[in-house]
Amino acid sequence: MMPVQAIRRVAQYLLATNVVLGALFFAGCETVPQGIQQARVEMTQQIAAEPTGDYYIGRRYYKPDYKFWGYVRKAGQPWSTAELVMLNEKEKLAPDRERLEFGSDNNYEYKLYGDFSGDKVYEPASNGIYPEFVLKGYELISTTPTPIFKSQMSGRSNPTDLRYVVEKPE
């Protein structure tokens, strides 16, 4: 049988361990800053109010080492439904390529005209296969749209740290 002091020591150790683990658990929980939270609420309302039509919404997602174009979603659908696409530019060049300023439009939001071809395209840097979007035209919506990536919302969107990270919109 264990002496009472040994039992107390074990109980104190277990309590201290639980407190430390609890603190670590809650430290990992992030809250979204109030301004960004309000902007996301407004973005959700704007998306819901988008008129239906023969167009898509695209967010340029430029990574120097990758060849995908960015995320594309149907009008009226949330960003969580968007697909990372390879752009077919046979009919229309991408905005940055038209200006010969590759990647200069990172995070810009566009109204895109075109369609998914149904084909899948291999992208070697990410070792991923992405749907092909055939671009026929575009209109710039915003150069400073509401954040859709976790790194943008947390304020930790350091390009060096995220160079090889492919984020998904939330």
Can you name each region flagged by the protein language model?
Residues 2-3, 30:
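N-terminal hydrophobic targeting signals that begin at the initiator methionine
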Residues 25-28:
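C-terminal motif of bacterial Sec signal peptides marking the signal peptidase cleavage site
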Residues 31-170:
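OB-fold and OB-like single-stranded nucleic-acid-recognition modules
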